[in-house]
């Protein structure tokens, strides 16, 4: 295909136009008085959201070069969401400010590589300042405050997240699902999470969140590697007849077996996902036995003379729901017998008491926590499907931000920490004026998140920034909800340090890429329609399956 090539400032200007289009759509959601964005869906009713990354992900531009800029900015928002669970709009606002100011200086003749070095120095200094000023959170009240702010001021969400953490511990497994009624409840169910993700992204059922969600699945636990599905045909046929999904947990699923599962998943004949078993060696076997007890299934092991071809559907475990991400698998509400689970817990406790190895003790305690801790489920209800989905998005954001706060502590919110941190950059020593200009870019950009929060509340951002910079107290800020100047920490307006840090680092990374880019190569726009016909789903034969 022919390529379109642009050099220098001409290309960068077009990239920045794409950055501006995406940033203008996302920035309106920032702060307690941020607005909603309505997004057309390919099917069903439109989505209404105040979540920056959801807005960013929905944007594709027709112009290829502008779209390249939008996609770069989208990557900053997406990365912030993946690492810290929040801060996506802050990352977008910062990245746009850094890229815009940097491009102006490059056009004025400054060296882009030295500008980048100056920006990197400044960002590292601000990150250290954020770490220094962060405060650990311990109380339920502080956890609720973080959840409230991250869910756009919804106190109920903050309180429910704090309650869920109290039930299963700060490191415990908490999931979010839609309720069948108007209420918003916390329920603790039998469940387990382990650190193994899907073996192929083709198993994903929710492409927006990149997770595989299996409702009421069968669970096959196999001790060895699966490289050929031939021995499994009888059990696979039985699962297809039941019209329920299947989760395969094995030492590994590889080659022909994995390819066949993927093909059948894509053709819709078999709702399936496969993950590697957690742990190694003897510990792997023990953990698989734990999962078997939790789900009322059997571990298919050759030690007991069991063979895959002889396995019936009765040997499979079951659970209410399984969610699989790139890195983790969460089994919610396994159908295991309560007494069997309690007996297994007692057995592990006695092993902990008997072992002399610190390492073994630690691993046994991990197993005990997984088996006995349970899973807290936040059940989100509402009057309409649109309302439930919008609220569920906010709950998921708030939960991720609260976890980040527990991990790295909190700082003053509302853009105040970044604003005051910018003033510590005046004393940085650099090699030349171009690097100094890079530092100045960061100093100016760090004002933008606070300005945007204030402007979304209907006030003048520049005036508020000026007033705050006159004040020596680093926690002194502007409460955009009540339109008052307050001590942000005392007022409970706090942000997770990890969210603020990640937003800045991801924004600087993307902005640096833009200002150091000299040539752009994209596909030449084509007037022809796509000549490839759409794929047809399903195949004849055994339930659309192809073994």
From Swiss-Prot:
Q: Where does ATP bind?
A: 29-32, 50, 86-90, 414, 495
- Which keywords does this chain's UniProt record carry? ATP-binding, Chaperone, Cytoplasm, Isomerase, Nucleotide-binding
Its chief place of residence is: cytoplasm
Going by the record, the broad EC class of this enzyme is: isomerase
Q: Which InterPro entries match?
A: Chaperonin_Cpn60_CS, Cpn60/GroEL, Cpn60/GroEL/TCP-1, GroEL-like_apical_dom_sf, GROEL-like_equatorial_sf, TCP-1-like_intermed_sf
Compartments reported by the entry? Cytoplasm
A GO molecular function annotation here is: ATP binding
- Region named Disordered: 525-547
Q: Which GO terms describe its biological process?
A: protein refolding
Q: Name one Pfam family in it.
A: Cpn60_TCP1
Q: Does the keyword GTP-binding apply?
A: no
* PROSITE patterns from the UniProt entry: CHAPERONINS_CPN60
EC number(s): the record gives 5.6.1.7
The text of the family note is: Belongs to the chaperonin (HSP60) family.
- Entry-linked NCBIfam families: GroEL, PRK00013.1, PRK12849.1, PRK12850.1, PRK12851.1
Quote the function comment for this protein: Together with its co-chaperonin GroES, plays an essential role in assisting protein folding. The GroEL-GroES system forms a nano-cage that allows encapsulation of the non-native substrate proteins and provides a physical environment optimized to promote and accelerate protein folding.
What is this protein called in UniProt?
Answer: Chaperonin GroEL
Gene that specifies this protein:
groEL
């Amino acid at each position: 295909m022919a390529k379109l090539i642009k050099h220098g400032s001409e290309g960068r200007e077009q990239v920045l136009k794409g950055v501006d289009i995406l940033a203008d759509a996302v920035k309106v959601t920032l702060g307690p008085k941020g607005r909603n964005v309505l997004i057309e869906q390919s099917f069903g009713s439109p989505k209404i959201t105040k979540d920056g990354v959801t807005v960013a992900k929905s944007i594709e531009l027709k112009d290829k070069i502008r779209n390249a800029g939008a996609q770069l900015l989208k990557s900053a928002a997406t990365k912030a969401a993946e690492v810290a669970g929040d801060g996506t709009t802050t990352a977008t606002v910062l990245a746009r400010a850094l890229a815009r100011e940097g491009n102006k200086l490059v056009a004025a003749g400054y060296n882009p590589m030295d500008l980048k070095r100056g920006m990197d120095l400044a960002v590292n200094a601000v990150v250290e300042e954020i770490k220094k000023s962060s405060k650990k959170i311990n109380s339920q009240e502080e956890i609720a405050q973080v959840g409230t702010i991250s869910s756009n001021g919804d106190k109920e969400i903050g309180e429910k997240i704090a309650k869920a953490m109290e039930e299963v511990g700060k490191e415990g497994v908490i999931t979010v699902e839609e309720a069948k009624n108007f209420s918003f409840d916390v329920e603790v169910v039998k469940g387990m999470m382990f650190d193994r993700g899907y073996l192929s992204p083709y198993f994903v059922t929710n492409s927006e969140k990149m997770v595989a969600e299996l409702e009421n699945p069968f669970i096959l636990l196999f001790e060895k590697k699966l490289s050929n599905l031939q021995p499994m045909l009888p059990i696979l046929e039985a699962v297809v007849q039941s019209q329920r999904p299947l989760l395969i947990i094995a030492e590994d699923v590889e080659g022909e077996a994995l390819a066949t599962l993927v093909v059948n998943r894509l053709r819709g004949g078999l709702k399936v996902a496969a993950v590697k078993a957690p742990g190694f060696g003897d510990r792997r076997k023990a953990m698989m036995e734990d999962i078997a007890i939790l789900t009322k299934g059997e571990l298919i092991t050759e030690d007991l003379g069991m063979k895959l071809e002889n396995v019936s559907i009765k040997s499979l475990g079951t659970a209410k729901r399984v969610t699989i991400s790139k890195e983790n698998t969460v089994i919610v509400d396994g159908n295991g017998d309560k007494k069997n689970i309690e007996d297994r817990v007692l057995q592990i406790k006695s092993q902990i008491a008997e072992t002399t190895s610190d390492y073994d003790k630690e691993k046994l305690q991990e197993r005990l926590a997984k088996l006995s801790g349970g899973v807290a489920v936040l059940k989100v209800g509402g009057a309409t499907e649109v309302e439930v989905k919008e609220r569920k998005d906010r709950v998921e954001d708030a939960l991720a931000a609260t976890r980040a706060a527990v991990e790295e502590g909190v700082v003053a919110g509302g853009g105040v920490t970044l604003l005051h941190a910018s003033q510590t950059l005046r004393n940085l020593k650099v090699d030349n004026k171009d690097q100094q200009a890079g530092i100045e870019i960061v100093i100016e950009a760090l004002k933008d998140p606070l300005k945007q929060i204030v402007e979304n509340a209907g006030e003048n951002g520049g005036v508020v920034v000026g007033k705050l910079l006159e004040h020596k107290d680093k926690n002194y800020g502007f409460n955009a909800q009540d339109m008052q100047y307050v001590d942000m920490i005392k007022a409970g307006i706090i942000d997770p340090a990890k969210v603020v840090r990640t937003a800045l680092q991801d924004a600087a990374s993307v902005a640096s890429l833009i200002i150091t880019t000299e040539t752009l190569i994209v596909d030449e726009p084509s007037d022809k329609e796509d000549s490839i016909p759409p794929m047809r789903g399903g195949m004849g034969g055994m339930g659309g399956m192809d073994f």
